[in-house]
Amino acid sequence: MERKFNDQELIRREKLKNLQEANQDPYEIEKVSRTMTIGDFNSKFAKLKTHNTNNNIKLAGRVVALRQTFGVIRDFYGDTQFYLNKKKVSKSMLEYFNKVLDLGDIVEIFGSPFRTQKGELTLDVKKIKIVSKALKPLPEKWHGLEDEELRARHRYVDLIVNKDSMKVFVDRIRILKIIRQFMDSQNYLEVETPVLHPILGGANARPFITFHNTLERNFYLRIATELPLKKLIVGGFDKVYEIGRIFRNEGMDSTHNPEFTSMEVYAAYENMEYMMRLTENLFKYVAKSLKKPVVKMGENEIYLTQKFRRIHMVDFIKQETGVDFWEVKSNQEAQELAKKHNVKFEKHQSTLGHIINLFFEEFCEAKCIQPTFVYGHPIDVSPLSKKDYKNPGFTKRFELFINTKEYANAFAELNDPIDQYERFEAQVKEKSLGNDEAVEMDMDFIEALEYGLPPTAGLGVGIDRMIMLFTEKSSIRDVLLFPHMKDKK
């Protein structure tokens, strides 16, 4: 396929050709022996006042600025200025700087540190060599709303030119470490479970399907890690968690990506209230570790170290609408209330439990600005949750909402194999009525429960949304290194 290059790209390719013909091919270089990183250079000579000719330093990085005989070089750890003194360097070196070097080139520079008249730490360069030629120029402008898609599509360029973007992803790594530190401090073991599942389960979502050639059957990319983790509790593990990729063949928006990271947590012999405390303590631990007790999301300031609000779903609906679902006993009555309040429902959502959940989504979610635990979800929308024996029709389940978005979902796990079998059957019926997200019958999981699952509490946390919260980003694209994108038109 023939490629077309613009004028700048053609000039850079010509410079590369000249280097190669002069036996200076930068791509032949395998290793650069740096004296130190640029970050270490800036730290070591932070108090330097005069020219230190006794220190001969070799630095390496990308050229991100050029002006006359000055330049700026950048590596992962920082930026520093460099300078070629016309009176000191050879004519050939000066010509190399002026006629061969381009913005974006990766170079090694050798020289000694000094301070300019303006007081800026600078490397007085004796020798400069390109170790990787940039054949594409860096963009001149790389900011503003119009560039958001471009930045996500070409993340490598975004990372080169946008320090703020690099910081977000370094923060992401740091937050993941902090989460693991917290889980380790609570005596949890991190485990790994399969990504390919033979049966769809663990969440209500549409899957990606792939074909296993050897086994001659379809598999699903996991939509949750719940069922295999609960099997580990059956097997005798006490406290486990998994941080990993989840795949859901659904839409994309500011808080959804088809491939995302979640953490699921399971603890034997614990209940919903324990998991609620653990969730609150996790968010507070991360907030304190990052020294961010308050984060700003849009116009809202979120207070993460204050006590999280707790409210039952039915009480919340009554508070916002005046409708008291504690007094509603039939599907027909619920449907009439839905029509009266313009709450639309599909055929598979015509039960009392589904309509309660729809009322919550319609009238209550938007009111959850500060961290709020909403608990007591209907059985109809909670096929894996233990029922609330004091309130038939409801479960021991909660969701954590912050700034109107769900951040965590947890419950006392259903460990009654007979009840679980019946709920799977109900899900199969829902699928036949058009609910593409209903789970399938999983007899292997039923058999695992029949061996005995102790009373268990479980939790799922959306890691990407959590990172959005602590980095104060409004789009999931901004916290994913390589988000899924529509094809270029």
From Swiss-Prot:
Catalytic activity: tRNA(Lys) + L-lysine + ATP = L-lysyl-tRNA(Lys) + AMP + diphosphate
Localization in the cell: Cytoplasm
The EC number(s) this enzyme carries: 6.1.1.6
The record's free-text note on cofactor binding: Binds 3 Mg(2+) ions per subunit.
CDD domains referenced in this protein's UniProt entry, alphabetically: LysRS_core, LysRS_N
Binding-site list for Mg(2+) 2: 406
A GO molecular-function annotation: lysine-tRNA ligase activity
S-adenosyl-L-methionine among keywords: no
Keyword Nucleotide-binding: yes
Pfam families xref list: tRNA-synt_2, tRNA_anti-codon
BP GO annotations: lysyl-tRNA aminoacylation
Alphabetized UniProt keyword annotations: Aminoacyl-tRNA synthetase, ATP-binding, Cytoplasm, Ligase, Magnesium, Metal-binding, Nucleotide-binding, Protein biosynthesis
Cellular component terms per the entry's GO annotation: cytosol
Lineage: superkingdom: Bacteria
Family of this protein: Belongs to the class-II aminoacyl-tRNA synthetase family.
NCBIfam families reported in the protein's UniProt record: lysS_bact, PRK00484.1
Name of this chain's protein: Lysine--tRNA ligase
